[in-house]
Amino acid sequence: MTGADKRDSCGDRPKADRNLMSNKTISLTTSGGLIEGECDPKFDGVLQTFVENFEKRDELGASLCISLEGRTIVDLWGGKVAPGGAPWSRDTISVVFSATKGASALCAHMAADRGLLDFDAPVIRYWPAFGQAGKEAALTSMMLDHSVGLPHLRAPLKKGAFYDYDHMIGLLEREEPFWRPGTRNGYHGVTSAWTVGEMVHRSTGKRLGKFFRDEVATPLGIDFWIGLPAEHEPRVAPMIFAPVTDEVRNSRISQAATDEKDSATHYFMFNNGGFNPNSREAHAAEIGSATGISNARGLAGLYAPLANGGELNGLRLVSRDAVTRMSLCSIATHEDVTLRIPTRFSLGFMKAMDNRGLENAAHCSLIISDPAFGHVGAGGSIGFADPASRMSFGYTMNRMGFGILMNDRGQSLIDAAYRALGYRSDAGGVWIDSNR
């Protein structure tokens, strides 16, 4: 794994003012299998919730890592890599789907922080061929906050299109936007792999996967890959898809995808060129929106510097100003054009997604504190940084849950973490520090 022997992925810098105790070793047998790891006693509520996910919420295999002020306070894993399969081990990794977007966004912010990329500049300054079919005025920032108007492609994609980077770049260059860039907000579920990835490529001279490996994963010592080397394939837990129930069929996103044949939602759901997230082709491809492969330590380790002003253990990834930009909402809508729910994004990061108005989806929203930012992945994986509490959080799993991206397994762990910090829930959909 990348630098795994060099440093604890979640950091190891202690801070006395949190009154944290020494972590205790965990080894618990549940109905879903063995749970192992370590946990600070102050976060026993998080441990209990992790156990409940296996006992009550149909968890199969999962990992959870939380750091506070650079110190790992929760590091848990357990369950099975497949139904009836081997135990989920400390080094098991899995596809984190759109939680990859946070890693891609960080790369873009690093390029901007180095003066290589200007978020206020036209895209065509860096990528001239992008300025076709009504996209000539698009700004770089629009590529990051899902407002550029390319949530998907209309023409049927060839088999394996997502694995062919240059092919996808050419299609996006020629595609007419679904709306005038900057005027609406619609989740770019897969296409941001190439819109954001190519901005990193054009500004730094490195493809996204290589930039991430060289400038982020290796220096941090995290087990996180955008383009997985073949030798790590045996560690990957396959993703188990949620069954299609009547509740899923009757959801707003499913109804729109089925009934509105020329909508962004329809193309997002059905035009995927036979994409298979469990294939070696998907794992090897540098799809910076969807096929990052990691575990909870990798996700929490990615966000640990961002929860601490851009620096961890003497390694500075970005400036404090860059972290502030990541935290500030860039665009918000009451109905995302693609997802058909309220969403809020900063430049490249998700701030909130609100499923609370949907039937049987009260616990399938992303509810974090107002300064926090990160990204959810399909099925429920999640990573985020909270600069106010200096907490970083990572959760991965292999049995995908119901709901649009988020589900109650991941959100219940987030809720437990904030409660352990003394936060209280707000009806508006954020966690608030009770001590402030």
For the regions a language model picked out, list residue spans one by one:
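Intrinsic-disorder-associated, low-complexity terminal segments enriched in Asp/Asn/His/Tyr and depleted
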Residues: 5-8, 12, 17-19
